[in-house]
């Protein structure tokens, strides 16, 4: 159990914090200032984020995840939003890997992904809808203040 806690702290929390400070807090901000095109800055930082993970088959999902974190930062104005999202994502991966390595209901975990294409599409649509709704809520909040 202590190995899980140590992994969540190192891989989940510290890596999420460090990567977001670099990719969104520094790189995306520099790109925004230099390019003056916020969407291009988000996607440039996401591209570099995905490329520097050096995983060919995970490039596109990581690119989308990087863009998600980039827009979360852009729209919220707070680096803590993508830091928390990144830390939660990394911590979930660590926890699932730990459960798989410790044979904790591995059969049920395998069945959970049997509809992965449908689940991935539905998840992507719901995520985009939530991001658009979040942006609208932020825009409405700024108009009333």
Would you name each region that the model predicts?
Residues 1-15, 29, 33:
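Juxtamembrane helix-loop-helix connectors linking adjacent transmembrane helices
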Residues 1-6, 61, 110-118:
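Juxtamembrane helix-entry segments on the extracytoplasmic side of multipass membrane proteins
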Residues 18-44, 71-78:
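Membrane-interface helix/loop boundary segments of multi-pass membrane proteins
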Residues 9, 60-67, 88, 92, ...:
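Membrane-embedded alpha-helical segments of multi-pass membrane proteins
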Residues 87-145:
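C-terminal membrane module of polytopic membrane proteins
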Residues 11, 38-53:
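Small-polar-interrupted transmembrane alpha-helices in polytopic inner-membrane proteins
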Residues 22-31, 60, 84-85, 92-93:
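Active-site-flanking alpha-helical
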Residues 44-48, 64, 84, 88:
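Hydrophobic residues within alpha-helical transmembrane segments
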